[in-house]
UniProtKB/Swiss-Prot annotation:
This is Elongation factor 4. SMART domains: EFG_C. Keywords: Cell membrane, GTP-binding, Hydrolase, Membrane, Nucleotide-binding, Protein biosynthesis. It holds the Pfam family GTP_EFTU_D2. Belongs to the TRAFAC class translation factor GTPase superfamily. Classic translation factor GTPase family. LepA subfamily. It comes from Caldanaerobacter subterraneus subsp. tengcongensis (strain DSM 15242 / JCM 11007 / NBRC 100824 / MB4) (Thermoanaerobacter tengcongensis). The keyword Membrane applies. The keyword Transmembrane helix does not apply.
Length: 603
């Protein structure tokens, strides 16, 4: 190992939402004198407005600090940020692979949460040195000793030397820096071997093209070199390399062990895939770094402009977002009810919400979204297998042999008082109980196998409301399982409304269908003819409501008189209404669609 590499430390921070990760990062940057107080912006590393608002980290932003340790040497510390949310697990695993150590930040008053656990296990798989940091010790409810015991019980790492800090008050920051220098090993690697660099993130710059954030494992990279991507085999010429002092800072070359960025006039972030290996095109390495996999969208939904004229703007906005977010996929889609729009694929629910919110906020679009769905595998009787992400493409029931749906293993961490309601919720959502273990006396770790379809809709909200916000959830994809699923169609005035079709479990179809028709009845205005609203599975109607017609009182001018006269007038009115119903069309207002998507929130 070269002399230079002894003084490099690459580390990441693992923490649950709101346990103080970004604030701690700010303090470390401030302490190393890297930015003046004036430049210190709260939560330097969270660039998107949305990130600050929700207090979550979505896009990673690495930073390089120089720290003069107590032993008199100057160390280069590279902090690689990790997103803390389940949707971005693969991104987290790549960030972790770029480090040798991790700070595990736990809130002194709350203890460990399910998502933190998932990320810690990832870090342990990559053999990282984990330094527990118990943050927010200035809070009156802080109980560092209990949290230490939790860390030892649950994760099984020694917490006797856990650091006690308060990032907000700036307590214990120096100890954290010293621990990074002393306890995290320096990077391994050989700068004389052919270049191998791991991409752990990328973003799109209007002038320089797609910029890859890399950790150099072997070899070195400098301007003018030709580089090759392992996954696509494409070759580019390097135009700039540099490090992060939070902003991009060009340097001559990056060598093994260092963290930095590479710009090479790459037109599309699809070519700088997270987890891919970059090598020298003229002297390539034999094999890529392990662990790369293509990111597969798990959740799909249709996004349509509320105003048809916004279609082009929506397309442009999605293309711009895709420049920075390679995991977002979309294709044009049309719906008889909603007009032209796009079918989009996301990593998970949070990802979907963020994309929708950014479209509405940053591009001022008014959107209508259809109910989210997952990818089903439909096995047809002729031996064909279809992968369905859109319920409207489902073949007729007679052609289907069976359907498989994606299953996830959910880990739920919950206070003991709420175990009952949570188990009940999981059972309602077709969960299969796998096991539970008590952590301390106050909290329980529950494991369930559940269909992704049941989680994706509003499971998280329901979980939070039944546990008053105390539960935390983590899930990982397990595979596909055969299930009894049917397509539920909604007919308004005898015509199928494609935007409302959904795939549901047979046992829940009746209840779901009934709820939707009731909701639609409230939201569709009365017309001059009566409108039947029906829920159907195939050709079988399972629920019906009728929106009564508005009618004129045709008997108003009959005073007394013969009953047959009245009958004649009523019959005539009825005939007219019948004729009207055959040729009339029903406009379904936007609110009706929205009300159906929010159905489950009212439980």
């Amino acid at each position: 190992m070269s002399e230079r590499m002894k003084y490099i430390r690459n580390f990441c921070i693992i923490a649950h939402i709101d346990h103080g990760k970004s604030t701690l990062a700010d303090r470390l940057i401030e302490k190393t004198g890297f930015l003046s107080e004036r430049e210190m912006d709260k939560q330097i590393l969270d660039n998107l407005e949305l990130e600050r608002e929700r207090g979550i980290t979505i896009k990673l932003k690495p930073v390089r600090m120089i720290y003069k340790a107590k032993d008199g040497n100057e160390y280069e510390l590279n902090l690689i940020d990790t997103p803390g949310h389940v949707d971005f697990t693969y991104e987290v695993s790549r960030s972790i692979a770029a480090c040798e150590g991790a700070l595990l930040v736990v809130d002194a008053s709350q203890g460990i949460e399910a998502q933190t656990l998932a990320n810690v296990y990832l870090a342990l798989e990559h053999d990282l040195e984990i330094i527990p940091v118990i943050n927010k010790i200035d809070l009156p409810s802080a109980d560092p000793e209990r949290v230490k015991r939790e860390i030892e019980d649950i994760i099984g790492i020694d917490a006797s030397e856990a650091l006690l800090t308060s990032a907000k008050e700036g307590i214990g920051i120096e100890e954290v820096l010293e621990a990074i220098v002393k306890r995290i090993p320096p990077p391994q690697g050989d700068e004389d071997k052919p270049l191998k660099a791991l991409i752990f993130d990328s973003f799109y710059d209007n002038y320089k093209g797609a910029i890859s954030f890399v950790r150099i494992v072997d070899g070195k990279v400098k301007r003018g070199m030709r580089i090759k991507m392992f996954s696509t085999g494409k070759v580019f010429e390097v135009t700039e390399v540099g490090s992060f002092r939070p902003d991009l800072y060009p340097v001559e070359e990056l060598k093994a062990g260092e963290v930095g960025y590479i710009a090479a006039n790459i037109k599309n972030v699809k070519d700088t895939r997270v987890g891919d290996t970059i090598t020298d095109a003229d002297n390539p390495a034999d094999s890529p770094l392990p662990g790369y996999k293509e990111v597969v969208p798990m959740v799909f939904c249709g996004i349509y402009p509320a105003d048809g004229e916004d279609y082009e703007n929506l397309k442009e906005a999605l293309e711009k977002l895709q420049l920075n977010d390679a995991s977002l996929v979309f294709e044009p889609d049309t719906s008889a009810a909603l007009g032209f729009g796009f079918r989009c694929g996301f990593l998970g629910l949070l990802h979907m919400e963020i994309v929708q919110e950014r479209l509405e906020r940053e591009y001022n679009l008014n959107l209508v979204t259809t109910a989210p769905s997952v990818i089903y595998k439909v096995y047809k009787t002729n031996g064909e297998v279809l992968e369905l992400d859109n319920p409207t493409k489902m073949p007729p029931p007679t052609q289907i042999d069976h359907i498989e749906e994606p299953i996830v293993e959910a880990t739920i961490m919950v206070p003991t008082d709420y175990v009952g309601p949570v188990m009940e919720l999981c059972q309602e959502r077709r969960g299969v109980y796998l096991g539970m273990e008590y952590i301390e006396k106050t909290r329980v770790l529950l494991k369930y196998e559940m269909p992704l379809n049941e989680i994706i809709y509003d499971f998280f909200d329901a979980l939070k409301s039944r546990t008053r916000g105390y539960a935390s959830l983590d899930y990982e994809f397990k595979g596909y399982k055969k299930s009894d699923l049917v397509k539920l169609d909604i007919l308004v005035n005898g015509e199928v409304v494609d935007a409302l079709s959904m795939i549901v479990h047979k046992d829940k179809a009746y209840e779901k269908g009934r709820k939707i028709v009731e909701k639609l009845k409230e939201n569709i205005p009365r017309h001059l003819f009566e409108i039947p609203i029906q829920a159907a599975i195939g050709s079988r109607i399972i629920a019906r409501e009728t929106v009564k017609a508005l009618r004129k009182n045709v008997l108003a001018k009959c005073y007394g008189g013969d009953v047959t006269r009245k009958k004649k007038l009523l019959e005539k009115q009825k005939e007219g209404k019948k004729r009207m119903r055959q040729i009339g069309t029903v406009e379904i207002p936007q609110e009706a669609f929205m009300s159906i998507l929010k159905l489950d929130d009212q439980k």
